[in-house]
Regions:
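A short helix-loop-beta submotif of the ANL/AMP-binding
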Residues: 48-71, 82-91, 181-182, 200-210, ...
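ATP-dependent adenylate-forming carboxylate-activation enzymes
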Residues: 45-49, 63-83, 96-98, 207-228
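Conserved AMP-binding/adenylation subdomain of ANL enzymes
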Residues: 165-182, 189-234, 249-253
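Conserved S/T- and glycine-rich ATP-binding loop of Class I adenylate-forming
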Residues: 41, 58, 92, 141, ...
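AMP-dependent adenylate-forming
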Residues: 1-15, 142-144, 151, 300
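Conserved pre-ATP/AMP-binding loop-to-beta segment of ANL
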Residues: 117-118, 122, 126-146, 152-153, ...
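Conserved AMP-binding/adenylate-forming core of the ANL superfamily
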Residues: 3-56, 72-81, 133-135, 156-162
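Conserved adenylate-forming
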Residues: 77, 85, 97, 105-119, ...
Length: 303
């Protein structure tokens, strides 16, 4: 198994490496058929495995991936248009449900209207011919990663194939002690920590990863720690606020059944790290096997 997608309450989907390769190449083949090599693709997916298939489909096809969020009828549609305009996107990759719901919102966003919308879950047929896939160089653009835009318009950062490989290699080197383990992330894949740590690093590492929706964690933080317990995860983490949320929201009753002894790397980054947060989390969860030395403060693309 390459990736799991957990609903946080016991349900899961899974995809093997072979299935992921076939699905990604099928998407790549369709983009090659449409002549999209070198173009920018806006990726707008709900949490799940379809994003992973589409993202690797872009890498196969030599299409620049632009991870983004799904459109909603509020300010976020305007932010999507700003990203699409800046990236000069020509195609939108998504699933049929999101595409159909987006139709009524596009009147205010002429740029999004002109995109070639491709629902990857409707594609059928054989995977694309591997001989037709372009050969990529390390210096070629792979991803346009956009900032959150919390202080203004989102800004795109150009990440080459070489940039990404070097970053992933550095993470793997740092997490060397967890080579036999499995990871879990609830972080959104359109942010760099969720994309690199949750989608790219696991495949390079050759270890499975469990994906969860951010809302699954935010609505009930104990689901994160229950997933670590269930899957015996060795690597998982998030921004500082996630550890505060666990300490503050998880009740004594919810603590029952947790077992965090497998957790070897609890990374913490993407925002300021507070010593009090680490101390409080350790004190709260030591009784269920969390070890202080598991904490791994880090910084990456966001910083």
């Amino acid at each position: 198994v390459a990736f799991y997608f957990s609903d946080g309450d016991g349900g899961e989907e899974r995809i093997t490496y072979a299935e992921l390769q076939r699905a990604s190449r099928r998407i790549a083949g369709e983009m090659l058929r449409r002549g999209l090599v070198g173009h920018r693709a806006l990726l707008m997916f709900p949490p799940g495995l379809e994003f992973v298939k589409a993202f690797y489909g872009c890498l196969y096809a030599g299409v620049v991936a632009v991870p983004a969020f799904t459109p909603r009828r509020n300010r976020n549609v305007q932010r999507l248009q700003a990203i699409s305009d800046d990236a000069e996107a020509s195609v939108a990759l998504t699933v049929a449900d999101v595409r159909d719901r987006a139709v009524g919102m596009l009147d205010e966003t002429p740029t999004l209207q002109t995109l070639d919308w491709l629902a990857v879950d409707e594609l059928v047929g054989d995977p694309g011919d591997s001989d037709a896939m372009p050969t990529m160089r390390p210096d070629q653009l792979a991803v346009l990663q956009y900032t959150s835009g919390s202080t203004g318009s989102p800004k795109g950062v150009m990440l080459s194939h070489g940039n990404i490989m070097y970053n992933v290699m550095a993470i793997v080197y740092s997490f060397e002690s967890t080579q036999t383990g499995l990871g879990i992330t609830w972080l959104p894949t359109y942010h760099d920590m969720g994309l690199v740590g949750g989608v790219l690093k696991p495949l390079y590492f050759g270890r499975p990863n469990v994906l969860m929706s951010p809302m699954v964690f935010l609505q009930k933080p104990v689901r994160w720690l229950r997933a670590i317990t269930k899957y015996r995860a060795t690597v998982s983490g998030g921004p500082n606020f996630a550890y505060d949320l666990c300490t503050q929201k998880i009740t004594d009753e919810e603590m029952e059944g947790l077992d965090l002894r497998s957790w070897q790397v609890a990374f913490n980054g993407a925002e300021p790290i507070r010593a009090a947060t680490l101390a409080d989390f350790c004190q709260r969860f030591a009784s269920v096997g969390f070890r202080e030395e598991a904490f791994f403060p880090c910084y990456g693309m966001a910083e």
